[in-house]
């Protein structure tokens, strides 16, 4: 008899919970006809694309320095200058815009020096450029995982960003290709 009462109670409990689940489902609203303003979303996507274009050009420049290719580094510097100059800051707060103006102006100056210089001088400017791009990413964010890598030997220690956690040193290139370590992961 006790088992029968327990079975009936369990069935009653199941029936009540099933009824509640059906009622909750009826409460879900259909938003199919609702109009949404996607302009902000499109702006954010365009902004992400501009930030990612700057990063892509930066990585191309880094890879040219890793490969000891002065000419390709100069060409990459030219592309990076264009990406930096076309970067739209309008979707950021006033404070962020002011910071971005300073960062982008400085980064542009160093990228322009890279365009006109021999590889040793390109690497000197790449150090400051890397700091600028890292500062920019701290404001803009990124959709990809980045790795801040560090070489303790170049100019008393120098960092750069990479899309790979595998260390490829742009400051020494083939001389010390794997000198360095990942010091931070940026997501």
Predicted feature locations:
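Hydrophobic core
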Residues: 12-16
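Intrinsically disordered, low-complexity terminal tails/loops enriched in metal-binding residues
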Residues: 2-7, 17-187
């Amino acid at each position: 008899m006790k088992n029968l009462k327990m079975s009936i109670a369990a069935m009653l409990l199941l029936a009540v919970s099933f009824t509640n689940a059906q009622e909750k489902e009826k409460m879900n609203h259909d938003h199919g006809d609702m109009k949404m303003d996607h302009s902000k979303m499109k702006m954010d996507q365009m902004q992400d694309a501009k930030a990612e274009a700057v990063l892509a050009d930066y990585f191309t420049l880094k890879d040219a320095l890793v490969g000891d290719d002065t000419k390709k580094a100069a060409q990459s510097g030219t592309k990076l200058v264009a990406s930096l100059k076309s970067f739209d800051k309008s979707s950021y707060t006033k404070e962020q815009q002011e910071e971005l103006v300073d960062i982008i102006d400085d980064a542009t100056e160093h990228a322009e020096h890279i365009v006109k210089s021999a590889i040793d001088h390109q690497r000197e400017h790449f150090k400051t450029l890397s700091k600028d791009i890292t500062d920019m990413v701290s404001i803009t964010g990124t959709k990809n995982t980045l790795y801040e890598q560090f070489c303790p030997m170049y100019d008393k220690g120098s960092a750069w960003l990479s899309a790979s956690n595998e260390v490829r040193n742009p400051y020494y290139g083939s001389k010390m290709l794997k000198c360095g370590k990942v010091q931070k992961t940026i997501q």
